[in-house]
């Protein structure tokens, strides 16, 4: 109904995450994509199961939208990219100006330590600290970066190693910015990623919470393979490990790599640390006569 859609287009939250960053309202994600003032607010949603992926985005002010659906086991990254590509091309065809997004930002001098700390993200542990030059540094997907403060409160990622200063790497790294925030009492980390015609905004993770690792989980560490018959044809790598006294679950499948810090809540139960859809997802451990089994997101894995 029209009234339902109008309600979904409103953002009536007691405490929004950030007015300039995406928020989840009544079934719609607000401002996950920033395409500039000429385009206006972009709303949408998406979801997936193991073998099905779909997303849609639309612009109320322009009465324009796009829906992308697949039933491929390897298209989880494709459908979002394709959806935005088609939407941009449609807007350009209609004569609506879509400017290329710019990653350049004016840097300022800032001695704040608000960013310092350990964060649990979908890319694994992100530890932000100051080096011997008092610069904020960290690693994103094992790539060392420097964080430069910007006027709007964000910190722009800049490359450290010479090889990452090659234009193709440099533009990708500098296109990412991070910002600390507090939501409902929880310290979280916002991110902004500049694409060619839009900026993607969201939450990358939250402050890491230290957890004791019992012997049951230490003994279960190792490589796992899918035990479920219905998922046996899916190529998947799964590993449970301890890195620097941090319990980590690493899964690579369907063109997606998940590297999550775990919080142990029992001898055979842990949850993912982070923020968003996968945060607090349960990881169930079970020891049988033929070895260790691990259940995550409804899929059973067996230790190799």
Task: Please place each PLM-identified region on the residue numbering.
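Catalytic loop of the DD-peptidase/beta-lactamase superfamily, centered on the K-T-G motif
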Residues: 1-232, 241-243, 250-257, 263-304
């Amino acid at each position: 109904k029209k009234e339902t859609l109008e309600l979904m287009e409103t953002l009536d939250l007691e405490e929004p995450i950030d007015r300039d960053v995406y928020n989840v309202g009544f079934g719609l994600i607000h401002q996950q994509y920033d395409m500039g003032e000429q385009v206006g607010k972009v709303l949408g949603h998406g979801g997936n199961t193991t073998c099905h992926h779909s997303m849609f985005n639309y612009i109320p002010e322009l009465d324009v939208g796009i829906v992308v659906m697949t039933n491929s086991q390897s298209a989880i990254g494709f459908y979002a990219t394709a959806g935005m590509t088609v939407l941009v091309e449609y807007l350009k065809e209609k004569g609506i100006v879509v400017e290329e997004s710019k990653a350049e930002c004016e840097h300022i001098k800032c001695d704040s330590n608000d960013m310092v700390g350990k964060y649990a993200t979908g890319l694994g542990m992100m530890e932000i600290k100051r080096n011997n030059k008092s610069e904020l540094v960290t690693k994103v997907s094992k790539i060392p970066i420097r964080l430069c403060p910007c006027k709007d409160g964000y910190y722009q990622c800049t490359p450290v190693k010479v090889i990452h200063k090659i234009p193709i790497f440099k533009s990708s790294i500098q296109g990412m910015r991070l910002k600390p925030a507090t939501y409902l009492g929880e310290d979280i980390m916002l991110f902004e990623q500049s694409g060619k015609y839009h900026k993607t905004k969201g939450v990358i993770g939250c402050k890491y919470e230290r957890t004791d690792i019992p012997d049951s989980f230490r003994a279960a560490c190792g490589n796992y393979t899918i035990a479920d018959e219905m998922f046996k044809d899916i190529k998947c790598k799964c590993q449970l490990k301890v890195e620097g006294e941090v319990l980590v679950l690493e899964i690579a499948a369907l063109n997606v790599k998940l590297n999550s810090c775990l919080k142990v809540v029992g001898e055979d139960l842990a949850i993912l640390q982070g923020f968003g859809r996968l945060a607090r997802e349960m990881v169930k451990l079970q020891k049988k006569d033929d070895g260790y089994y691990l259940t995550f997101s409804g899929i059973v894995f067996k230790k190799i």
